[in-house]
Amino acid sequence: MAEVILCTATELYNILNQSTKFSKLAEPNYLCLLDARSKREYNESHIITAKRAKQDEDMHFLLPESIELDCMRYCVVYDSRTDSLDGDGKRLIFNTLIKYYIHKILIFEHCHHFTGQAIQCAKVMSQVTRLPVRVLKGGYEEFSGYYHFFRSQKVFWMPQEIDDFRPYPIEIIPGLLFLGDLQQASNRHIQKDLKIKSHVNVSLEPTNLALPSGQEFHIPVPDSCDSDLLQFFPNACKFIDSHMATNCAVLVFSKLGISRSSALLIAYLIHYRKCTLQEAWNHILKCKTNMRPNRGFVKLLSEWEKAILGHQLTEVADPTF
């Protein structure tokens, strides 16, 4: 039996937006996303690509048909608003009682959510999966509050529709810092949905968006082991700091969003969190699984770690890098 763990809204958002040349959602064994709410709630609105978790006549959750869960990279389950793994729902019941006494209204229709539907469903799925089953912390309510543009009423997704899905930038610091590519940086709908106001462009190419003065920091370097990205780290960090301080979301991007932009964000996390290169690397890798700064950038990041922390604490000769 696999483990059942919590998954934040940001983690699910990033899972949905992983890509290589195409969205990872097009891979049949990548993600099984299950909605454990009622049929009515599911039909009203659910997270894109989610399937409704079915139950038998005794209200026991059933394994989804035609899905090989033991081969799935991710299995994520959500209900309305589960926020812990104990499943007792005491906080939710307490909140409902407060609403009852204040408004004299109690909606019994939603009482079945207090028993931790997502947890019950996840435990059934964990009996056949190899990897941990994730329960979405905060459920649909929290996720849809942050990412309203990922709500859908579509029940069936055709393969071509999945192939045509255009991923959004990866979220590094919730609501404030994103990692993307040139196409995403040029998409007005993405900028609006994520409330992105500022860009750090780590590529030779410009975007087709005209940003106000002071809202873009351009680092025109090629993706080469000989490129001196280090000289731009201090001013880039100051730029990101100044915009995040005013709750202004920043998108850091390069042509493909894999090497140059990843390197700059690793440098920023070392500066921002005063963490090691290894810790910053692990965070970016967790957010974007195919990030890969070139070897020249790795050496520069090692120098940056020493400049910020006073010591070189990460062994970059390790094959991991």
List the model feature ranges, each with a label.
Residues 19-20, 65, 104, 320:
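Generic low-complexity segments that are intrinsically disordered, proline-rich and/or Lys/Arg-biased
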Residues 25-252, 256, 264-312:
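Cysteine-based protein phosphatase catalytic domain of the PTP/DSP
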